[in-house]
């Protein structure tokens, strides 16, 4: 069919900790620009909506690579949030072995979504690996189809 090759995938773990005290008053995503540990990003998700957290608690969402251990995650979170994580409770952990396509060095940020006259391929593997990338590639395909009068 002449389809584009399937990209290699990267995995991740999403960790959810509850805590009685919020380490931040914002809903901003925190990343470590110094690359000191396994945490890719973290945020106080209950600062976006209190309903996400157990009653009377705050909910921290954290994404790591697949090799992370809970002790490494807690150590890194303590650095990023500037507080002890000793009283944080792990309430869920989700391992996602094929979470995102690997972008790769030298790969164009946007791949053509039209692969033949009647075939369009969309997904975050065609643009930036993210939910936004998946939506963007779908929009590109929809616009192409509408502009072609199909």
Question: Which residues make up each language-model segment?
Answer:
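Mid-domain catalytic core of redox enzymes
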Residues: 1-80
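Conserved flavin/dinucleotide-binding core of flavoenzymes
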Residues: 45-150
